[in-house]
Amino acid sequence: MEDSDSAAKQLGLAEAAAVAAAAAVAAAAAAAAGGEAEEPVLSRDEDSEEDADSEAERETPRVTAVAVMAAEPGHMDMGAEALPGPDETAAAAAFAEVTTVTVANVGAAADNVFTTSVANAASISGHVLSGRTALQIGDSLNTEKATLIVVHTDGSIVETTGLKGPAAPLTPGPQSPPTPLAPGQEKGGTKYNWDPSVYDSELPVRCRNISGTLYKNRLGSGGRGRCIKQGENWYSPTEFEAMAGRASSKDWKRSIRYAGRPLQCLIQDGILNPHAASCTCAACCDNMTLSGPVRLFVPYKRRKKENELPTTPVKKDSPKNITLLPATAATTFTVTPSGQITTSGALTFDRASTVEATAVISESPAQGDVFAGATVQEASVQPPCRASHPEPHYPGYQDSCQIAPFPEAALPTSHPKIVLTSLPALAVPPPTPTKAAPPALVNGLELSEPRSWLYLEEMVNSLLTTAQQLKTLFEQAKHASTYREAAANQAKIHADAERKEQSCVNCGREAMNECTGCHKVNYCSTFCQRKDWKDHQHICGQSAAVTVQADEVHVAESVMEKVTV
C-alpha cells in the first residue's frame, strides 16, 4: 500500500485519484500472479494539475514520464507497469524503469495541453538511466504529430518536433522501434544533403547550357527510355547530352546534372534507379502501354585475377651468409630462404675447450644483420676427425689427430647449441673486447696452430696446381689460335690462285668455261672464245699432238729399258 501511494504521488494525481490508482495497481498485481493482467482505468478532474506539477520534482527510486492533457473525465487511459516489490528495492537504485502514459480522445484546445516536468536535469540527476529513454507526448488529436524527447544518461534532453505519431497508443512492455521517417525527410541515409524536392517525380536537370525535366517513371537504361523533356520533345539521357554537345563523353550519368551534382550522385544514394541494358520494360521500350519485367542496373567492380601479381613489390629474400670468426678455417654457412643450410669448406671445432666466435650474418643488397656472442658447443659423442670431409687431404694428419673432451661445465645439453645475441645492423663485425683468455683456451689455440699452417700449405699447393693447369690451357689455346690463323691464310692463298687460274685469257674476268680441246684455256663467254680462236687454234691441236708423241716416245724408251734388263 505504501509503494502504491508513492507511485500515485509520482504520477501527480490527486488524493482521491491516488486511492483509486493504488487499488487498481494492487488488483493488477494480484491478476498478474494468477496469470491474467488487467489495465486499470482512472478518471481525474482538471483541478489535479497543480498537484501533478508539485509532486513531479520529488526524488524517487523510479523515474516516471507522464504526458497529461486537459480533458473531460472518462477520456484518459493510463497504462502502468508493475511497481517494485520489497525485493526489487536494491535493483531499482541501479536501473531506471519508465512508465509511459498516453492520453487519447482529447478534444480540448491547444492552450490546455501541458507537460509535466519530471524529465528535467534537477530531478533525474540522482538516478541511473540505462541507455536512453524515449517519451512520446501527444500535442492534440487533430494534428497527427508528436514530440520526441530523448533523455540521455547525463540528464540532457534533446527535443525534436514534426515527427509522425504512432497509429496506436503505447502499451506497457518492450517498446516498438521508432516509426521510419518520411521519404522527404530521410536525410540520414544519403551521402549528400539533398533538397526535399529531390524525391519528386520530376527533376530539373541541365547539361551544359541546355535544361530539361527528368521524369523518374520514364527513366530507362540511359540509351533507351526517353525520360527528359526539353520543350515539346522527349529525349533519352544519351540523346540529351548529345544535343548539348557532350556526345563524346559517353557517360550521361556525369554529364547531366541536378542541383549542381551529376546524376551519378543520385544513383549512389538510391534516388534514381536506372535500368539494365537488357531491360524490356515499358519505359525502355518507349511505350507506356506495354508491361514487361524491370531489370535494374547493377554496378560491377573489376575483380583481380588469381594469377595477377600484387601492385606492391615483394621483397626477395636473398641467402644469408654466416661466418664464424675466429676459426681454424674460414667457414661460411649459406642459409637460403627455404631454410636449407649449405657450407663452403670444412667446419672444425676445437674440442679442447669452448670456442668463442663471432657470427656475422650478411644479407645483400641491404645491410647485414650482425650477431655477436655465439657459443658453439658439441655433444659428448665425438665423430671421427674429418670422417665426413675427405678433401682436403692432410697426409699423416688424420691418424695423429688428438681429440680432447669438453669440460663438464661446457656441456649443458647433449646437443649442439648456438646462441645468438642480436646487435644493430652494421657494415663491419663489431670489435670484440680484449680480455685475458683462460689457460685452457690458450692451450687450445696453441694446439690448433699447426692445423692452420697445414691447411694454408695445402691451399697454396692447390692454388699453384690450378694456376699451372690454367697456364697450360692458355698455351694450348694460343697454339690452336696460331694454327687456325695459318690454315686460314693458306686457304686464302690457294683460293686466290685458283681464282687467278680460272680467269679469262681474253679479258681477264672470272672464267666460267674452258676449252674442250685442251682443257687448259678458260673463257668467260663465247665471244671471248671466238675472238681468241684465231691464235688459240694453232696451239690447241699441236699441244695435243706433241703430248701424244711424247707419251709414245716415252713408252718406247721404257720398253726398251725393260728388254735390255
From Swiss-Prot:
One Gene Ontology term of the molecular function aspect: DNA binding
Region of interest: Disordered: 34-62, 162-190
Gene Ontology CC: nucleus
Alphabetized PANTHER family for the sequence: DEFORMED EPIDERMAL AUTOREGULATORY FACTOR 1 HOMOLOG, DEFORMED EPIDERMAL AUTOREGULATORY FACTOR 1 HOMOLOG SUPPRESSIN
PROSITE patterns tied to this protein: SAND (PS50864), ZF_MYND_1 (PS01360), ZF_MYND_2 (PS50865)
Residues recorded as bearing Phosphothreonine in the entry: 171, 179, 432
Gene3D superfamilies on file: 6.10.140.2220, SAND domain-like (3.10.390.10)
Sites where the protein binds Zn(2+) 1: 504, 507, 524, 528
Protein's organism: Pan troglodytes (Chimpanzee)
Name of protein: Deformed epidermal autoregulatory factor 1 homolog
GO biological process: embryonic skeletal system development; neural tube closure; regulation of mammary gland epithelial cell proliferation; regulation of transcription by RNA polymerase II
UniProt keyword Transferase present: no
Subunit text: Homodimer. Interacts with LMO4; LMO4 blocks export from nucleus. Interacts with LMO2 and CLIM2. May interact with the corepressors NCOR1 and NCRO2. Identified in a complex with XRCC5 and XRCC6. Interacts (via the SAND domain) with the DNA-PK complex subunit XRCC6; the interaction is direct and may be inhibited by DNA-binding.
Keyword terms, alphabetized: Developmental protein, DNA-binding, Metal-binding, Neurogenesis, Nucleus, Phosphoprotein, Transcription, Transcription regulation, Zinc, Zinc-finger
Subcellular localization(s) per the UniProt record: Nucleus
SAND domain location: 193-273
